[in-house]
Amino acid sequence: LPLVADIAAAGHQIALHSATHQYSKIYASTDAFWQDIRTLRQALEPYVDVAAIDWLRFPGGSTNTVSHRYGGNGIMKTLKAQAEDKGYHWIDWNVCAEDATASHPDAAQILRNIRRDADGQDTCVVLLHDTKATGQTVKALPDMIAYFREQGYNFCTVAQMDALQCETK
């Protein structure tokens, strides 16, 4: 986690996701979800100003259906409303690298997936993963960045994009 301080100092935005990423636990109830977020905030507290973190991404996305198995059909709708009530903004992706799938794609396939999903999009929010099992993502990253620049995209934080401070393609 100390790396998070360096990431924030470099101007990157820190957002909340999950302390455990265990759907069966975090989506068992809304209380379980928010406890997981509190645990994450406590872990980050020594490294960044957690009071300034007001963005999150729901594991599986805000429209995931796997959560229904654990917390019922309405849990995501309730969590989204609660997030807004708590002062959080939440974001989903529209471009998926598919880098965390069981097939473990190589860097070339990750880039093909991104190009496929980005085609026709004015604004792209790309889902990438940084686990040990997804080492190919790091290898694909320079080519991803080059691709988006060649296509005329600009890079910005989610907060900048939300505030329309970052021009779309």
State the predicted function of each range.
Residues 2, 21-127, 131-149, 153-154, ...:
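Catalytic domains of cell-wall/extracellular-matrix polysaccharide-remodeling enzymes
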